[in-house]
């Protein structure tokens, strides 16, 4: 009995330190948010660049630290709905690797919608980024795009954030 308890304790200790495997991200679904845009003359259109990091370098350039990314798309208006028209995800080399929002979606006042890039999805690399096209009625309150990168491995943890910048083209 004593041997059995000792073995059980050893197994529990060893497995509790094991890193949990991240599941593959589910397809990003927005069909319940798809909408037709109001007339173009009632909207201001814009574009925002958001830097993210699928991984960062640790010790040297061949050793990386994988990160989970949460992209937050925030409507900061208290009264007007905003529209996300399109979103593209690019890797470090600038290659488009994924497309989000194939049809316009709405974000209600003070609402946030999110995209999660799983920790084991390193396709974007250390210089990944998004470009979002959007439309708003209230020119004073453009959407806010933020990303939070996080990893907790063993006893180490790292987290940081980035904020989108409007681009004009």
List PLM regions with ranges.
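Short, hydrophobic/aromatic beta-strand segments
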Residues: 80-87, 99, 142-146
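Terminal connector regions
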Residues: 21-29, 121-169
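Short, solvent-exposed beta-strand/turn "edge" segments of beta-rich domains on protein surfaces
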Residues: 56-64
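Post-signal peptide N-terminal segment of mature Sec-exported envelope proteins
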Residues: 25-47
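Asparagine-centered strand-capping/turn motif at beta-strand->loop junctions
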Residues: 73-80
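C-terminal motif of bacterial Sec signal peptides marking the signal peptidase cleavage site
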Residues: 13-16
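Intrinsically disordered, low-complexity Pro/Gly/Ser/Thr-rich segments with frequent PxxP/GP/PP motifs
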Residues: 92-127
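Short, solvent-exposed loop/turn segments enriched in Ser/Thr/Gly
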Residues: 64-70
